[in-house]
Amino acid sequence: MDAIVKNFPVLDDTSGRPTQKEAEEAVRVLLRWAGEDPAREGLKDTPARVAKAYREIFGGYDLAAEDVLGRTFEEVSGYDDIVLEKDIPFYSHCEHHMVPIIGKAHIAYLPNGRVLGLSKIARVVDIYARRLQTQEAMTAQIARAIDETLVPRGVAVMIEAEHLCMAMRGIKKQGATTMTTTFTGEFKSEPAEQVRFMTMLRGFK
């Protein structure tokens, strides 16, 4: 898993990030390249809008999963079985063509003395989704963040998504779904735990 996981640093003011003005000018260049006139009425404000939208869409680069996962809770009444959150919706962008990836994540872990607030898992998905991604890398990144921060007995992550780079261009196969999984700890070493994870997913349909 280490080979695929990318460690994105939290950016600061010294990172060399272009300014808002430079980002807007880059959009104007793309508009001209596409054959458009960025000065026409309908496009005059587009560069600023695109730069603002991209700041939000790619806001995950400014966030660290470890900060979100830093606060945990003692297990309630000694609960130590699977904790599963399924159907967590997300959108991301393909790092190859910068077009959307739309999907949902299913995440489970086996507690080892501590549990996460339920919203924290969804926030971690959001952090990694709001970056340029491959689905394989995102799956591994989520699993690693939870595994290293919470140190549970095991983590299971499944992502299913439609890649618009495959639907809008190239082979143009709309509706095709890609599924990826990553398992750590007991989910990786104990096939029965993987079966339980998959059974719980199917049972909640």
UniProtKB/Swiss-Prot annotation:
One of its GO terms (cellular component) is cytoplasm. Keywords: GTP-binding, Hydrolase, Metal-binding, Nucleotide-binding, One-carbon metabolism, Zinc. It comes from the Bacteria. Its EC number is 3.5.4.16. Pathway: Cofactor biosynthesis; 7,8-dihydroneopterin triphosphate biosynthesis; 7,8-dihydroneopterin triphosphate from GTP: step 1/1. It catalyses: GTP + H2O = 7,8-dihydroneopterin 3'-triphosphate + formate + H(+). One of its GO terms (biological process) is tetrahydrobiopterin biosynthetic process. Toroid-shaped homodecamer, composed of two pentamers of five dimers. Belongs to the GTP cyclohydrolase I family. This is GTP cyclohydrolase 1. It comes from Sinorhizobium medicae (strain WSM419). The lineage of its organism: Bacteria, Pseudomonadati, Pseudomonadota, Alphaproteobacteria, Hyphomicrobiales. The gene is folE.
